[in-house]
Amino acid sequence: MAPKETNKMGLPNLPSALGQIYPPDRFLTARAQLLPYESDALTVFRARPLAVVLPQTQEEVIETVRLCHREKLPFVARGSGTSLSGGSLPIEEGIVIGLNRLNRILELDPQERIAVVQPGVINLDVSSAAAPHNLYYAPDPSSQSVCTIGGNVAFNSGGAHCLLHGMTSNHVLGIKAVLPDGEIVRLGGRSLERIGPDLTGFYVGSEGLFGIALEITLRLVPRPETYRTLLAAYRSLEAAGEAVARIVAAGILPGAIEIMDRLALKAAEAAVHAGYPEGAAALLIVELEGESIEVDPEFASLQKIIEASGSYEIRVAQDEADRARIWKGRKGAFSSVGRLSPDYIVQDGVVPRSRLGEALAEIERLSSEFDIPVANVFHAGDGNLHPLILFDGNEEGALERAEELAGLIVRMCIRLGGSITGEHGIGMEKRAYLAEMFNRTDMENMIRIRRSLDPYELSNRTKMFPEMGEVPPLEAKPPAPAIGSTLQPKTVEEVCQSVRSFPSLVCRGGGSKPALSRASQTAQILDLSRLSGVLEYQPEEFTFTALAGTAVAQVQQILSQEGQYLPFDPVLAGRGATMGGTVAAGTSGSGRQRHGGIRDFLLGVSFVNGGGELVRGGAKVVKNAAGFDLPKLMIGSLGCLGVLVDLTFKVFPRPRRYVTLELERPNLADALEQLSRLKSSGFNLEAVDLEPPGKLWVRLGGNSETLSGRLDRLRNVLGRGEARTDEEESSLWQRATDFAWSPAGASLVKIPVTLALIPSLEEHLSQISCRRRYCSAGNLLWLAWTDALERLESILQTLGLGGLLLDGPGAGPFLGLRDGQVLTQRIKQALDSQGRFPDY
C-alpha cells in the first residue's frame, strides 16, 4: 500500500500556488484569520492549518483539490464547523477548504420531490424552501438551523426523527463529488432506485475521506397532515424507559421518542425557559405523525399507555406553537449545558433499546465513581445515547478524567452490543475505539478501500482510523484447480475456504434471478442455498440477522408471527429468492413505497473478500455511523466485491390489514397526473403501481377501524375504483412481487426511472408488445421484454437510463448506462485485487 506523504510546499510557497485560484480576501493565512477555524464544536481539540481557502464555485473546489493532490498537500473540507467529534479539525500541515459560500439550492422539483443543493446549504433552509409545496427534508439534527448539508453527508447526520425516517443516507439520492485525486464522479441520480452498488449511500458517512461533495440530490417528503405530540414527566429515569418499552411492544411506531434527565432539564430551563414540569427526574417526548384519521386513534392508545406508566404530568400539544415549545428545550439541550458547566463532552453511543436501562444505570455509576456530573439526553426510540459529561477545563486533570469517563461509556456501548456512534461520526474523538468495535481484518479492508481512492490519505487525514501500521495486500491467487461440481458450503468457514481455493467464482442463491449467476467455463459455482438460517431475531429491537442463503419466504413467515415485516418488500419470494441474493441484486418490490428500499433497512453485513477473509460492516442496532457503510456498498454489488454470508436488517410493525384501490384511467397522461397528485399528497400509501396505459393499484395499510375512512378519502381524490381486500388483495400483490404477470420466456429487467421520464420511455415501449409495471409511484419499472435485447439497449442509451437483467438470455446483466464504474473498479481492487469475483 502506498505510504502517506506530507507536502513539502510549506507556507512560503502557498501564496504562489493558491493565490492563482483565490484573491486575498478568500485566501486566509494570518493568525487572527485562522483562529475561528482551529476547532469545530468539539473545542477540546485545536490545530492551526497552514491556510484557509473560501471557494465560491465548484471549479475552485476542484482546482484546489487537484493542486493538493499534485503537491501532496493534506486538506480538510469544512461547513459550519458543528461537528461534535472533531471531524472537521484542521491538519497542521494542510489547508482548510471552507464550503459555506457554495450555498445555493440549485433546483427544487416538487413533482419529483427532490432538491439539488450545494454543500454549504443550511439543513433547515431546504425545508424552508420546500414548505410552499407542502414538502420538507426529514433529517433534523439538533444543529439544523446552522449545520450544512455537506457536513450532514460527511457524517450521516440523524436527529430526533430517525426511528421512522432514517438518517441522511436514507435521503440522499445522488452526489456529484471530486475525489481526493481530483477526479469527478457522479453517483446515483434522481430515482429512488439504482443499478449496481449503492455508491451514493456508501459515500454518505465517509467523514470527508472520499473527497468533497459538490452537488447533493436530496429526497423530500410530504409534510404530514398532522403531528400529535405529548410530553410526560416521571419521578425516575427507569419509569420513563419502561414507558418506551410499552410503546414499542404495542406496535406503535412514533416519529420520535426522546428522553431528557434531571440535569438536562435543568440546563434547558436555564437557557431557553422551556416551561417543562417541575421536579421531573425524566421527561419523555413522543410524537406521532401522518394522516389524522390514522394518527388520532393511535394517539389515544399512546395516551393510555403513558397514563398507565406512572407519569405524574402529561401535556398534549394543542397546536403548532405548543409543539414548538415542547421541542424547544430538547433541540437546545446540547448548547444549554453551558449554563451548568464551563466545558462539556457530548458522547454519542448506541445500545440495543432493550438495554437502555442497563446503560443508564452504568452511566450513573460511572458519574458517581468519577465525581463528574453527566446529563443524559437520548433518542430512546433507537437507543442513541447522548451523555453530556460536565467539567471545568481550568481544573488540573479535569479534561483527562472527563475523557477517561467518556471512553468507558463508549466501551460500554460496544459491550452491550451497540455502536460507538449513532450520528456524530468517529472524527478525531473516537479513532482509538473503532478498532475495539471492529477487528483487525475489518479495519484493514476499510483502509484498503480508503487508499484505493486516496493513496496518500490527503483528504481529512487523521480522522476515523487510528494508526494501523502496515496494511498488507490480499494474498495472491493460488494455482487453479480443476472446476468441479457446484460447491455448496454450509458454514461461513467453508465459504472462506472455497474462496481461497478457487481463482474464479460466481455466487448463486435460490436461482430466482438466473441472469445474475451465469458462470463462465473457467468459474466455479458457489451455491449458498445451504448457508441458511435465522441466527438472531429480537422483535423488541426491530432487528434480525440471517445467513445469506436463507429463503425470503422463511424470514417473512418468522416475522409475521410477531406482527412484523420487511417494508422493502423483497421480490421473487415465491420463486425461492434468498436474503443474500436480494441484497446482491438490490431488488425491492412495490411495497417500498411507504418506508423505503433495501438501503433503508439493511443494518449490517458479513462478507468474504477476494482473499478469503471474513469482513464485517455496520452493526446490529438500528442506528450506526461507525466506519464506512459497507452494507450499502454490498447492495446491488452482484457478487462482484465479495460473498455475502450474513445480513442484519431492521424491520417494522406490519399493518394489521390492507385494502387496494384498483382504477382504470382512460390514458397514460391521466394516469400520470393521478400519480403526481398522489406523490404530493399526505396519504401514507403502502404501494402505488401503474400498468400502462392507465391501470392503477393504490394500496393502503393500517388498522381495520381506520381503513374504511382512509379509503373514502382516497376515493375523493382518485375516483371510485374497485376495492380489493383480504385474500384477493394479498394474492394481487403476491403475483406482482413474483412477476406472475410476466409472459413465459420473457426477459425480466429492472429499470430505475422517474415520473418525469415515463412519457419519453413510453413513446418507445408503447410501440412494442411488452408487459410492464411501474412501481413506487413511478420510480421503478419492471419490464417483461420479448424483443431483442439490443433494441432495449438502444432505447435505454437514448434516454440515459440503465437496466439490470434478472432473467433471460444476454451477454451480461447490465443494459444501457451505468454510473460509478470507475469508483467501483477502484473499490474492487481493494477487496478483490486478484479478480476472483466477476467484473463489474
Positions of predicted regions on the chain:
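FAD-binding subdomain of flavoenzyme oxidoreductases
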Residues: 104-111, 115-258, 459, 471-479, ...
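Conserved glycine-rich FAD pyrophosphate-binding loop
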Residues: 2-9, 22-24, 31, 39-51, ...
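Generic secondary-structure signature for well-ordered alpha-helical cores
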Residues: 16-24, 70-73, 128-135, 158, ...
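A conserved active-site cap/scaffold subdomain adjacent to cofactor or substrate pockets
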Residues: 279-303, 674-723
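Short, acidic (Asp/Glu-rich) active-site segment that either coordinates a divalent metal cofactor
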Residues: 85, 96-99, 209-215, 288-305, ...
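Glycine-/small-residue-rich beta-strand-loop submotif within the FAD-binding core of flavoenzymes
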Residues: 44, 88-124, 128, 136, ...
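Short, well-ordered beta-strand elements within core beta-sheets of diverse protein domains
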Residues: 51-56, 219, 228-235, 287-288, ...
